[in-house]
């Protein structure tokens, strides 16, 4: 039995006692030997950055509330935790702190685990793992070698950001204004060998599978559909001539709009295209441009926003219908890694081509017009409005200036051109996807070594399974210039497993999305000899996955893809890894700053600022506590280090207790919306916790409650009991179906307020109060488990795991009302209310409504034409 000071709510004492009980009883360890229905709930695993932030707290509290609720409703619940421990931040910290990334990572895990435990999450810690340990990553190494043998993993050249000073590849976010974030060197585009997984082989299945994910937000599914980007079109061949008329390798371009083919006035190719490199050999000016374009962006987003640049190659492409020769241009908005690296340019009907043609004086031809223009302006084609109707797919279009295809609509033109090109061997129908194969190579040290050996005789050879894992050395000196494993000949040099000759290991490591793509399955069998064992099919797919919508595309796409790889390897039976997805909103907070001498801003933490607010809680002024001088108000933004507006969860737990922090994080906003951190709101939750504590102790201090006798209750007692059971019904629905935790808390608060006004000290009055207080403690248990654990004992129910106590169920008989309050309207306007017996007849209700004093006044001089009764709600008297 825990000991708690009677009338004083001491969060630290209460929470320590509850956590000791949970640890001693191994309360949240689960196995598969249960007759209960399973429920697998988890949040996206954290990166061990060193400390939790409020985004973590919100994320993990959401999943913990659902997990505890599901336990109380009779489910066998798995809620695990682990660490996404590889990645770039550890390398950056190693440089800054002059320590090995492994040492930094493991120290952070220890600290963050303690923080998570202080928040009282119902986690099965026996399943914990870190993805940087060999006993975890050996399984993805084994899977990769199997994918190599199946042809699903392959190596080819790809363009990356290269820092020539640090001699390393940079992620896009490490390139700032075209320079390396650390060295300041001008970043180059460099083509280097990279390993890829053939996610494109699964593109259609990934697309079709979205239709089965009814429990995923539509916004996430839409983003994935757009990212997969299925399109149907024609692949068309353009023969190519050099300036001397010699024939070169043909260009193949994919288009979804073959109806615009006669509008092609040039062909655009990527700077890395073989034809561009061929032309540059005899064109120094073009060679210089290609060298300049090496320093540009490599992502679609960057290419979309940068200024259009290009140059004629001197080559020409032969139009496949007209036979006309059109110039071939290098254009910086064409990606070599997308499609064929070549685009048929139709400046009359494509914005990027239009902008490029305008800049370089290239011809622009209209080949599509509206079949039925709505006004005189639409009858005339010009650059100011053609995009509006061309992109409006609901309008009927027809071809013009297109020879024998004039007058055809899109469908007719598509079929005619497809038939022609397929007959002549100049093209074919094709389904294309925007989705690209997943590049999994990273030129970094702190990651899972790619299990490949390079032999001059045998080529790239997968490491034999009996030689796995290829272990990453952890005790290294890390400077940030190059990779320690690349410069370590002892680690790098080995023998070829096929021929026994001298060979070298791959020194690239896996993209860290690899580790986070299968960890959900590993939790089901964390000590299994293989990647997973039969227990995976008991738990998978996970029932609820909680995480930010910013992961909608990359992580969640790779996550689904890797699960299908595991399915095809017969490791799991399910097609999808997760049935339901909840994407929680950001945690935002006020920002404050002062202008810096360098023209920037010095951001000041809200904890260091004294804030003035108006009656609506809006910030009206702020001064720095240290000097009493004003600071600028920056508005509310996502908590971040860059804006210095983060709040330390540990300090909040120390000040208010874990339950209060959990309560505020669930009350301040619905899960999908942004949560504005406001310490005044936390204070409000702390006051509620103290009131609840006092309510329970006051009740218990007045003596033991007798058994409830429903038949003996007075009207007032019935009303309180009805309120209790209405609250039970609402909170259960809010937890289980709606995940609307803020309204669940509000309902319990309303019940608490009603109970505070209920001063009936009779035996049955106290029995009703006992039932209400027990219900409140259980209803709040998923959110405030420590206080609920203590208050359940105070109410005389003994120390037990509340997750094993059934969640309250509303008593239907308690919800029946003896009397109803109806609104009285005259011609639709509210004029009063009446109380009627629940079994009152229509005639009785009509008479009471017309006799209601205020309604009677408005009826003077009028004739009642009819009376409309909405049962249980409204009486509307129509009079004139």
From Swiss-Prot:
GO terms for biological process: leucyl-tRNA aminoacylation. A motif ('HIGH' region) lies at residues 46-56. Gene3D superfamilies: 2.20.28.290, 3.10.20.590, HUPs, Isoleucyl-tRNA Synthetase, Domain 1, Valyl/Leucyl/Isoleucyl-tRNA synthetase, editing domain. It catalyses: tRNA(Leu) + L-leucine + ATP = L-leucyl-tRNA(Leu) + AMP + diphosphate. Coiled coil: none annotated. One of its GO terms (molecular function) is ATP binding. GO terms for cellular component: cytosol. Its main location: cytoplasm. SUPFAM superfamilies: Anticodon-binding domain of a subclass of class I aminoacyl-tRNA synthetases, Nucleotidylyl transferase, ValRS/IleRS/LeuRS editing domain. A motif ('KMSKS' region) lies at residues 638-642. ATP binds at residue 641. Keywords: Aminoacyl-tRNA synthetase, ATP-binding, Cytoplasm, Ligase, Nucleotide-binding, Protein biosynthesis. Pfam families: Anticodon_1, tRNA-synt_1, tRNA-synt_1_2, tRNA-synt_1g. Its EC number is 6.1.1.4. InterPro entries: aa-tRNA-synth_I_CS (IPR001412), aa-tRNA-synth_Ia (IPR002300), Leu-tRNA-ligase (IPR002302), Leu_tRNA-synth_edit (IPR025709), M/V/L/I-tRNA-synth_anticd-bd (IPR013155), Methionyl/Leucyl_tRNA_Synth (IPR015413), Rossmann-like_a/b/a_fold (IPR014729), tRNAsynth_Ia_anticodon-bd (IPR009080). Disulfide bonds: none annotated. It is found in: Cytoplasm. It is an enzyme of class 6 (ligase). It comes from the Bacteria. The keyword Oxidoreductase does not apply. Belongs to the class-I aminoacyl-tRNA synthetase family. HAMAP family: Leu_tRNA_synth_B. This is Leucine--tRNA ligase. The gene is leuS.
């Amino acid at each position: 039995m825990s000991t708690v000071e009677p009338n004083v709510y001491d969060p630290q004492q209460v929470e320590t006692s509850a956590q000791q009980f949970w640890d001693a009883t191994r309360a949240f360890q689960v196995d598969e030997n249960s007759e209960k229905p399973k429920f697998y709930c988890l949040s996206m695993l954290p990166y061990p950055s060193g400390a939790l932030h409020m985004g973590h707290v919100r994320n993990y509290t959401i999943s913990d509330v659902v997990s505890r609720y599901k336990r109380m409703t009779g489910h066998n619940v798995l809620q695990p935790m682990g660490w996404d421990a590889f990645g770039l931040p550890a390398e950056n910290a190693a440089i800054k702190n002059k320590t090995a990334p492994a040492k930094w990572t493991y120290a952070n895990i220890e600290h963050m685990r303690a923080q998570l435990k202080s928040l009282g999450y119902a986690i099965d810690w026996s399943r914990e793992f870190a993805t940087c340990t060999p006993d975890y990553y050996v399984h993805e190494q084994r899977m990769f070698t199997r994918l190599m043998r199946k042809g699903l993993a392959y190596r080819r050249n790809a363009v990356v950001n290269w820092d020539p000073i640090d001699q390393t590849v940079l992620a896009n976010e490490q390139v700032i204004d075209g320079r390396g974030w650390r060295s300041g060197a001008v970043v180059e585009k460099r083509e280097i060998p990279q390993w890829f997984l053939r996610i494109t082989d699964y593109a259609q299945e990934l697309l079709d599978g979205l239709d089965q994910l009814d429990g995923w937000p539509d916004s996430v599914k839409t983003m994935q559909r757009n990212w997969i980007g299925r399109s149907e079109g024609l692949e068309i061949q353009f023969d190519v001539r050099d300036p001397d008329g010699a024939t070169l390798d043909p260009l193949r371009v994919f288009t979804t709009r073959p109806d615009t083919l006669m509008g092609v006035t040039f062909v655009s190719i990527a700077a890395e295209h073989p034809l561009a490199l061929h032309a540059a050999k005899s064109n120094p000016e073009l060679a210089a441009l290609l060298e300049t374009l090496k320093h540009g962006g490599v992502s679609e987003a960057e290419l979309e926003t940068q200024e259009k640049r290009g140059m004629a190659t001197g080559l020409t492409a032969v139009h496949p219908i007209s036979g006309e020769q059109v110039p071939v241009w290098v254009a910086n908005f064409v990606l070599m890694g997308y499609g064929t690296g070549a685009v048929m340019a139709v400046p009359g009907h494509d914005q990027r081509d239009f902008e490029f043609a305008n800049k370089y004086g290239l011809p622009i031809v209209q080949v599509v017009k509206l079949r039925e223009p709505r006004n005189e302006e639409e009858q005339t084609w010009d650059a100011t409005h053609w995009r509006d109707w061309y992109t409006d797919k609901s309008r009927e279009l027809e071809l013009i200036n297109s020879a024998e295809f004039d007058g055809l609509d899109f469908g007719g033109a598509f079929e005619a051109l497809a038939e022609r090109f397929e007959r002549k061997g100049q093209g074919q129908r094709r389904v294309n996807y925007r989705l690209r194969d997943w590049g999994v190579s990273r030129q970094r040290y702190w990651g899972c070594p790619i299990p490949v050996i390079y032999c001059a005789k045998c080529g790239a050879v997968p490491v034999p399974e009996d030689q796995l894992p290829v272990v990453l050395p952890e005790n290294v000196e890390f400077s940030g210039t190059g990779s320690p494993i690349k410069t370590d000949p002892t680690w790098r040099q080995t023998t070829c497993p096929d021929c026994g000759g001298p060979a070298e290991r791959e020194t690239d490591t896996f993209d860290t999305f690899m580790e986070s793509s299968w960890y959900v399955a590993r939790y089901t069998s964390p000590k299994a000899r293989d990647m997973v064992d039969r227990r995976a099919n008991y738990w998978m797919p996970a029932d609820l996955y909680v995480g930010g919508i910013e992961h909608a595309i990359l992580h969640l796409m790779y996550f689904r893809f890797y699960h299908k790889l595991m399915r095809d390897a017969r490791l799991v039976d399910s097609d999808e890894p997760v049935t339901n997805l909840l994407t929680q909103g950001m945690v935002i907070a006020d920002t404050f700053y002062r202008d810096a001498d360098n023209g920037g801003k010095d951001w000041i933490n809200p904890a260091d600022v004294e804030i003035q607010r108006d009656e609506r809680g809006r910030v009206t002024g702020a001064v720095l506590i240290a000097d009493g001088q004003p600071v600028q108000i920056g508005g509310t933004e996502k908590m971040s280090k860059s804006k210095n507006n983060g709040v330390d969860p540990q300090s909040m737990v120390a000040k208010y207790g874990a339950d209060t922090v959990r309560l505020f994080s669930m009350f301040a906003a619905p899960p999908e919306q942004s949560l504005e951190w406001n310490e005044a709101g936390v204070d409000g939750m702390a006051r509620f916790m103290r009131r609840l504590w006092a309510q329970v102790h006051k009740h218990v201090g007045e003596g033991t409650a007798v058994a409830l006798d429903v038949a003996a209750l007075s009207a007032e007692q019935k009303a309180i009991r009805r309120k209790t059971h209405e609250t039970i019904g609402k909170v259960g629905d809010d937890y289980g179906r709606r995940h609307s935790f803020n309204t669940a808390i509000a309902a319990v608060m309303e019940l608490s307020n009603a109970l505070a006004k209920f001063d009936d000290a009779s035996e049955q009055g106290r029995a009703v109060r006992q039932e209400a207080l027990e219900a409140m403690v259980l209803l709040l248990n998923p959110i405030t488990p420590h206080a609920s654990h203590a208050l359940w004992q105070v109410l005389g129910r003994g120390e037990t795991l509340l997750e094993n106590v059934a969640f309250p169920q509303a008593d239907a008989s308690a919800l029946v009302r003896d009397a109803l309050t109806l609104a009285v309207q005259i011609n639709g306007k509210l004029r009063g209310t009446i109380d009627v017996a629940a079994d009152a007849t229509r005639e009785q209700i009509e008479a009471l409504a017309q006799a209601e004093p205020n309604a009677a006044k408005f009826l003077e001089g009028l004739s009642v034409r009819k009376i409309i009764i909405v049962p249980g709600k409204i009486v509307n008297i129509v009079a004139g």
